[in-house]
């Protein structure tokens, strides 16, 4: 039988020790003898680190909260394990998750072998189509508006299980999004090939992670996985979706999707990521889409702030793009 690779599992915590403990418990019992679980506490300052250590977890403390990407990079620093596995602190891994996620990465690195794998992430709870005017709903342009049913109704089997992600896609305006978002789980039969990984539950070979220098830290949060997926693709590396590796995710437990901070950072990072990787028409589409949102939408303030921050960062992204192409050309020349 093929030996499965060793794994370092990294979970990032910020002021949500109990959620993080739940996530850690779900994956800890799946670890093999060569695997390591590392919890990064992003300067919570609320006693989280001490609470996590009482669970006999390995905790690495950051001196400041520099965002999700920086937290993962800190947790992965110095790793000797063969694969880095990421699990959101507000997710729970089903039994067999780790074994299934690592299976496509068991073969030695080769041109045809995938460099990363992304899990089947389901939304926690059960959901039903939302009533007209109902608030606190999730929306998909493909499947409509959904409201979560209460725990009692869920225990009776009411509602449906919905997909959160089967990987990452990018549209014509540079918007990174989850494939199969809010598709009923029983209807999801997506292919294994996918553009990119979802950072909420995924795995990447150590060699690929090191070659790419991990996540971009200046994005702080959101779009780190889209940016990393772009860089994997630009190197010619594949990402595969593993349907058997299942995790359940409490959507937006760590930061609400309607908060001004979420909107500002999302707008900024979408444009910056498009500028770093996409063709010029996509960058223009991203800018145009944001201008339309600014004029029409109710969240003008944070959208405008995010747009201004993105425009200020465009020269840096174009330089990054040029340097990246030069590095890839140099690497290609070395291997010819």
Model-derived regions, located:
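A short, conserved alpha-helix in the catalytic core of glycosyltransferases
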Residues: 195-246
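A conserved acidic beta->alpha catalytic loop
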Residues: 26, 41-49, 64
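Non-catalytic, C-terminal membrane-associated alpha-helical segments of glycosyltransferases
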Residues: 282-336
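Catalytic core of nucleotide-sugar-dependent glycosyltransferases
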Residues: 239, 258-282, 301-317
């Amino acid at each position: 039988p093929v030996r499965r690779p060793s794994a370092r599992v990294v979970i990032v915590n910020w002021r949500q020790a109990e959620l993080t403990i739940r996530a850690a418990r779900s994956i800890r019992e799946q670890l093999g003898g060569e695997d390591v679980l590392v919890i990064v506490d992003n300067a919570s300052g609320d006693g989280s680190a001490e609470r996590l250590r009482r669970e006999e977890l390995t905790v690495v403390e950051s001196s400041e909260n520099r965002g999700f990407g920086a937290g993962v990079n800190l947790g992965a620093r110095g790793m000797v394990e063969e694969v880095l596995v990421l699990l959101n602190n507000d997710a729970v891994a089903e039994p067999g998750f780790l074994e299934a996620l690592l299976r496509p990465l068991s073969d030695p690195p080769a041109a045809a072998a995938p460099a990363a794998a992304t899990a089947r992430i389901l939304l926690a709870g059960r959901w039903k189509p939302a009533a007209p005017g109902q608030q606190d709903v999730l929306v998909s342009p493909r499947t409509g508006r959904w409201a979560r049913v209460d725990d009692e109704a869920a225990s009776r089997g009411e509602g449906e299980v919905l997909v959160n992600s089967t990987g990452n896609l990018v549209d014509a305006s540079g918007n990174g999004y989850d494939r199969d978002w809010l598709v009923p789980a029983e209807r999801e039969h997506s292919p294994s090939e996918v553009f990119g990984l979802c950072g909420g539950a995924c795995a990447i070979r150590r060699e690929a992670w090191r070659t790419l220098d991990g996540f971009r830290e200046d994005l702080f949060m959101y779009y780190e996985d889209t940016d990393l997926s772009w860089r994997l693709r630009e190197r010619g590396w594949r990402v595969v979706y593993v349907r058997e590796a299942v995790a359940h995710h409490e959507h937006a437990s760590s930061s609400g999707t309607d908060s001004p901070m979420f909107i500002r950072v999302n707008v900024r990072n979408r444009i910056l990521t498009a500028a770093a990787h996409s063709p010029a028409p996509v960058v223009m589409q991203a800018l145009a889409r944001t201008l339309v949102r600014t004029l029409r939408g109710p969240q003008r303030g944070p959208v405008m702030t995010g747009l201004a921050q993105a425009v200020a960062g465009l020269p840096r992204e174009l330089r990054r793009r040029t340097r990246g192409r030069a590095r890839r050309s140099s690497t290609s020349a070395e291997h010819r």
